[in-house]
Each structure stands twice: as C-alpha cells, then as structure tokens.
Regions:
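Aromatic-rich, lipid-facing transmembrane alpha helices and their immediate juxtamembrane interface loops
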Residues: 1-267
Length: 267
C-alpha cells in the first residue's frame, strides 16, 4: 500500500468516530439540528467524495454501477417497507414523496452507501482499472432491473399492495443473503476476491454499527412494527435482528458480491 493510501485508510478508519463526535457536539450544543439527510452527508457522502478525489480513475464506473444498482431497487424496497411498517423515518426535509411513500433521503442513502462501498473497495483493495465502463454481464442486471421496476410500476398503479408480514426478513434473504451465498459457493475458488470482499465488509460493519447506534439515539429512523424475528438491545437503543444481519453485517458483502459478478472480473 502506498504512503498516501495508508494516510487515507487511517482517516477513513476514524471517520465514523469523527462523524459521531460532530453529531453529538452539534446536537448537545443545539448549534445545528441533525436529521437523516445531514447524517447521510456526514457518515457516507463526505468520505465517499474524499475518496473520489483520491481515486478519480474509479469514479465514473462507480457512479454508473451505484446509480443503476441502488435507485430502482431502493424505490421498490422502500415502498413495500413503508406499506408493511418495516421501518420509519420521522422527519424528512423534503415534502415530496415518490408514489406517496418513498422519501427522497432514502435514495441518497442507498446511492452513497453503495458508492462508498465500491470506491473504498476499488481504491484500497481491488485496484482494478478497466478501459471500458460496462462489462457484458451488466446487460443482464440492467434488463433485470428494468423489467422488475416496470412490473412494480404496473402493479402499484393497478392493484392494492397488501401488507407483507415479516417483510424485512424475507426481502433480506432475496437481496442480501442470496448474492452472498452464491459468491461464497460458486466462486469459492476465487479466494483472493473473497478475502478482499471480507476486508471491505469488516470496515462497513464497523461503520454501519456506529451509524445505527447514533441514528437510533437521535431518532433519524425507527422500527415501529413487531414483525421481526427478534430484537437487539445494545448501548441504550433497540433494533431488529434483521437490521443487524441484513444491513450491518451483510449489506457490503452483498453489494461487493454482486459488483464482482456483474461488473468486475472475479480476480
């Protein structure tokens, strides 16, 4: 690892703590009211933008993959999650909601979360520069997402969507668990890739855990339902077991597993 990369890694490693300290200071001193949107900037956007300046060669590809892979899926997931009461966002700075349910902050959250994961992975671990921005496999992801999203629009405009019991549990299996299981079984021979994915995921476990604790403490989001398979009580906050497994533990693993399959080289 180069000297500048070592410095950047040290900065990125302590950034979740810096973001938390800034949040606590601003909240306790009543200097500035924090909200979900501001938290996205602090915990995700700022470090992602910083790495973008340090790793310009990966930015365009990461932008394309993150936009394609986050926005359509998040709209569908958020719509169904809100209907089913899987989670809630008490405050939004935007009065407009997509399709009456989807706040715009979740789209920023999904995009910057995915973007940060991929740019971190490329800059610190993968170092894979390609001459083209679109791998052949990406067309399958593109068409799959397009067909899925158009089908979603057709359904919500023509039918009443029912409440889905234990929605968080079932959607997590499809979106997070399956990509990770496939990556670690079908591509078990690609040990170097698996190690890199695990290293990146370890950092995002640490980041997401801190982010979760701070977010729940200040009420940036919550979990109003009882349709969860269990609860985690820690450091004065309470969140579903699904949140621990799907987002905190497996989100980065799922993103990078899908990224390696569709738009990287599995090497």
């Amino acid at each position: 690892m180069k000297k500048n990369e070592k410095f950047d890694l040290k900065l990125i490693l302590i950034w979740p703590i810096i973001a938390s300290v800034i949040t606590i200071f601003l909240e306790e001193k009543n200097i500035f009211y924090q909200n979900f949107f501001v938290s996205i900037i602090l915990f995700l956007a700022l470090p992602a933008i910083y790495l973008s300046f340090r790793a310009k060669q990966y930015v365009l590809k990461t932008l394309i993959v993150s936009t394609l892979g986050s926005i359509p899926i998040m709209i569908v997931v958020e719509y169904l999650g809100q209907i089913s009461g899987a989670w809630s966002f008490p405050v939004s700075i935007f009065s407009f909601k997509l399709f009456g349910f989807v706040i715009l902050e979740v789209l920023f959250w999904a995009f910057f979360n995915m973007y940060y994961i991929i740019i971190f992975y490329e800059y610190f671990l993968d170092h894979h520069i390609t001459k083209h921005l679109w791998e052949p496999r990406m067309k399958y992801l593109f068409w799959g997402l397009l067909i899925g999203f158009v089908s979603f629009l057709f359904i919500i405009f023509n039918f009443t969507i029912p409440v889905i019991p234990y929605f968080y549990f079932f959607f997590g299996i499809i979106v997070f668990a399956i990509p990770v299981i496939l990556q670690f079984t079908i591509y078990s021979h690609a040990k170097k890739v698996l190690v890199k994915i695990l290293k990146a995921s370890a950092y995002f476990f640490y980041l997401s855990f801190i982010y979760e604790i701070v977010a729940l403490h200040y009420g940036w989001w919550g979990f109003p339902s009882e349709n969860y398979i269990g609860w985690v009580n820690i450091l004065g906050v309470r969140f579903p077991f699904e949140e621990l497994v799907w987002w905190i533990m497996l989100f980065a693993l799922a993103v990078l597993s899908s990224y390696e399959f569709f738009d990287d080289n599995e090497k």
